[in-house]
């Protein structure tokens, strides 16, 4: 009985995605030929919905339209792997990534 209660409770509460799924998200994002890196991955599951947020590191010289298109392609690939997922992608020029302070809770996501 306790296991049923625990599973029901887990389903209602937000949970960070397991490490294996987070690693898969990183592989998917970094697989795009124009992505130079990614960081600040945040992921969670709330009920049946998966939420994915990350920063893509892109070439400084891309136009806004090019960067937007790359972001869309990564988003669509993630949504294909996680149907129904809410995906938010922030784009960073590669030159500013080293200068950004990293919050302690994200140190392992660089």
Where in the sequence are the language-model features?
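Alpha-helical transmembrane segments and adjacent TM-loop junctions that form the membrane-embedded core
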Residues: 1-110
């Amino acid at each position: 009985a306790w296991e049923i209660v625990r599973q029901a409770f887990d389903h209602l509460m937000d949970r960070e995605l397991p490490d294996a799924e987070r690693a898969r998200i990183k592989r998917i994002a970094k697989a795009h030929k124009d992505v130079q890196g990614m960081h600040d991955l945040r992921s969670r599951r709330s009920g049946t919905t998966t939420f994915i947020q990350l920063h893509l590191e892109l070439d400084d010289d891309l136009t806004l339209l090019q960067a937007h298109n790359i972001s869309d392609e990564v988003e669509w690939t993630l949504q294909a792997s996680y149907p129904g997922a809410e995906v938010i992608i922030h784009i960073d020029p590669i030159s500013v990534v080293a200068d950004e302070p990293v919050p302690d809770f994200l140190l392992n996501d660089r």
